[in-house]
Amino acid sequence: MGKAKAPRRLADNEARAVLRTIRISPQKLNLVAALIRGKKVATALSDLEFSAKRISGTVKKTLESAIANAENNHDLDVDALVVAEAYVGKSIVMKRFHARGRGRASRIEKPFSHLTIVVREVEEKGEAA
């Protein structure tokens, strides 16, 4: 008995990877996500490899996870994958206290983010035999 299996939210030619609670602000993470949005996965991986942003290594790992999910779980062709979506969401915000002069205190906020990457298999254009 039990509950029926939920329908798949993505199309049959898509796979995704989600990384939650990353210790970086969503605004900074979105700069790196925008760098790979809409690109082929090989180009996106090389862009992340040589990016100077601190978080680019973490985003690269998540993209590699999405590629592995596409290959192993959904039998998609790795060479025909593009980054269909790369979006960032807000997570928790840790609040910390910072002692200031004259006995006062101020608040330091340490934001966290969520990252979702969706890769899609596209057919190559111009391969008419």
From Swiss-Prot:
Tell me which GO cellular component terms the UniProt record holds. cytosolic large ribosomal subunit
The record, for InterPro entries, names: Ribosomal_uL22, Ribosomal_uL22_bac/chlpt-type, Ribosomal_uL22_bac/org-type, Ribosomal_uL22_CS, Ribosomal_uL22_sf
Q: Which GO terms describe its biological process?
A: translation
Query: Which GO terms of the molecular function aspect are on file?
Result: rRNA binding; structural constituent of ribosome
Entry keyword RNA-binding: yes
Going by the UniProt record, its keywords in alphabetical order are: Ribonucleoprotein, Ribosomal protein, RNA-binding, rRNA-binding
The record's comment on protein family reads: Belongs to the universal ribosomal protein uL22 family.
Q: State whether it acts alone or in a complex, and with which partners, per the record.
A: Part of the 50S ribosomal subunit.
Database matches in HAMAP family: Ribosomal_uL22_B
Q: What is this protein's name?
A: Large ribosomal subunit protein uL22
- Organism this protein belongs to: Mesorhizobium japonicum (strain LMG 29417 / CECT 9101 / MAFF 303099) (Mesorhizobium loti (strain MAFF 303099))
